[in-house]
Amino acid sequence: LFDPAIVYAKGSRLMHMLRRWLGDDAFRKGLKIYFEKHQYSNTIGRDLWDALGQASGRDVAAFMDSWLEQPGYPVVSASVENDTLIIRQEQFFIGEREEKGRKWVVPLNSNWTGIPDTLETEVLEIPNYSALKAANSGALRFNTENTAHYISDYRGELLEDILAELASLDSTSKLQVVQERRLLAESGQISYASLLPVIEKLTQESSYLVVSAVSSILQGLSLFVDEGTEVEAAYKKLLVTFNQFNFERL
């Protein structure tokens, strides 16, 4: 039915990402067109993209080619400079970097109005951030529901806003923030020390998945703590605080 290039673990996530980018109605309509047109014939992957493009009016082939025809996936960073929201994509690396200038068609899936739904260039600049913020509620987030195949890197005041409301987010969003910050630390884009403010906001977390993810980070941080130092004392205090809530709850 589908091109072999997407029949593996990554494939289901990409199709879910595509479905959300197009919308359920257009996705269903495109599948209907595809099955009716090819019910008695062989197909290739582009036949499906053509049908979905016909139904949605969007360039589905270009969207999917950016994800299927090149390796890796992007990290999308967001920062505010001189009241301008700057959104930038680059390839995400853990370990040795070999920048190739790759770009993806990235569904931003923001929780704010006034944000484009897609990032197609390396950099997108949106002026008058203060007005944009005033017109929306809550911290700006991308890849809501974690349906797209990229990592978000919030910087400066954007990260501060997310941390301020982290404890009140749903479990999926909390887990997403924790996992993204951990991956950014593993890639060297942020320090492991910058994970501590995230953990401190989740000391009364009861979700098993979130608690497990944070516990894994805490265990890994122990490798960077020198014995007999103030850092070790602070680390042990955080460890006790984090575990105490769930110990008493149980």
Place the predicted regions along the sequence by residue.
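Non-catalytic accessory/interaction domains
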Residues: 1-6, 11-17, 24-28, 36-250
